[in-house]
Amino acid sequence: MAQVQMPVLETVRDNIGIAPFPEAKEHILEVKNLNIYYGEKRAVNDISMRIDKHAVTALIGPSGCGKSTFLRSINRMNDLIPSARTSGEIRYEGLNILDSNINVVNLRREIGMVFQKPNPFPKSIYSNITHALKYAGERRKSVLDEIVEESLTKAALWDEVKDRLHESALSLSGGQQQRLCIARTLAMKPEVLLLDEPASALDPISNAKIEELIVGLKEEYSIIIVTHNMQQASRISDQTAFFLNGDLIEYDRTEKIFMNPSEKKTEDYINGRFG
C-alpha cells in the first residue's frame, strides 16, 4: 500500500531550528540527567540513557518506581500535572523536547502513547481513526479511507472489522479496543510508540495478540513499553531498564538483564525477592 503523505502535519524538526546531535544516528532518544518532581517529591532521579531506533525497550520495576512517570515525560504528558516539574534533557533525534519552544502538539504526533486501559472514543471504528486527522485538517475521503485501512492493518485489526467500520468502537472486545487505540495512534504516523502496560487489563489470548503486534511494529517504529509482567518483557523486548525508587538501577540487553544481571537489586527483583 502506498504511503500517504500528510503535509498538514508539521513535524517537530520542521518547527525547531536546532541541529541534531551526531549521536542521533543510532539512537532515537537520549536522556541526560533527567529529574522529575511532583511538588517537593522527586519521582525520577538523575536518569541518563539512550533508546535504540527500531527496537522494543521495556521498563520494569515495582509499583511507584518511576517507570510510568519516566515514560510520560518522553512526550511531555507530565505537563498536564500541575505539580510536576522536570529538569535535564530528553533529546529526540537530537532535539531537546523539554525546551520551552517545542510544539508539544506536534511532539505528541511524532511520539504517540497508548494507555493501560483501552479508551476508544464513543464513535464509530472509522471515526476513531479519522478524528485527529480531521482535526489536523485532512478532509479528503480517499486519503482518510486509505489511512484507516493502513492503520487497522498495521494493528492486526483490519480483517476483523473491515465490514463494520461504521459500528460503535464500544462494541469491540477489550483486546480489539486496545488494538484500535494502537491503530488510532499509528494513523498520526509517529516515529516512537509509548505503551503504558497495554496488555495488563486483557485476557491471555488478547495479551498474546498485543505482544505479537508489538514485535512486528518495531520494524517501523521505536517502541518503549512499561510492563509489570517480566515474562512479557523477556519475550518481546530488545533492551530492558530496571527502575527502583526513582533510580535507574540497570539498563542492558534484555537477555543479560534476565540471565546475568550486573546489579544485585536487579537479580533480587527478577527472582521475585521483592516487588
UniProtKB/Swiss-Prot annotation:
Give the protein's function. Answer: Part of the ABC transporter complex PstSACB involved in phosphate import. Responsible for energy coupling to the transport system.
Give the location in the cell. Cell membrane
Instruction: Give GO BP annotations, semicolon-separated.
Output: phosphate ion transmembrane transport
Would you name any one GO CC term?
Answer: plasma membrane
Keyword field contains ATP-binding: yes
Q: How is this protein organized at the quaternary level?
A: The complex is composed of two ATP-binding proteins (PstB), two transmembrane proteins (PstC and PstA) and a solute-binding protein (PstS).
GO MF terms, alphabetically ordered: ATP binding; ATP hydrolysis activity; ATPase-coupled phosphate ion transmembrane transporter activity
Q: Which organism is it from?
A: Bacillus licheniformis (strain ATCC 14580 / DSM 13 / JCM 2505 / CCUG 7422 / NBRC 12200 / NCIMB 9375 / NCTC 10341 / NRRL NRS-1264 / Gibson 46)
What domain of life does the UniProt record list for this protein's source?
Bacteria
Please report the name of this protein according to its UniProt entry.
Phosphate import ATP-binding protein PstB 2
- EC assignment: 7.3.2.1
List, alphabetically, the Pfam families matched.
Answer: ABC_tran
Q: Which InterPro entries match?
A: AAA+_ATPase, ABC_transporter-like_ATP-bd, ABC_transporter-like_CS, P-loop_NTPase, PstB-like
Keywords, comma-separated and alphabetical: ATP-binding, Cell membrane, Membrane, Nucleotide-binding, Phosphate transport, Translocase, Transport
List all disulphide bridges recorded for this chain: none
- Residues binding ATP: 61-68
Q: Which family does it belong to?
A: Belongs to the ABC transporter superfamily. Phosphate importer (TC 3.A.1.7) family.
Bilayer topology annotation: Peripheral membrane protein
- According to the entry, every stretch annotated as the ABC transporter domain falls at 29-270
Q: What is its main location?
A: membrane
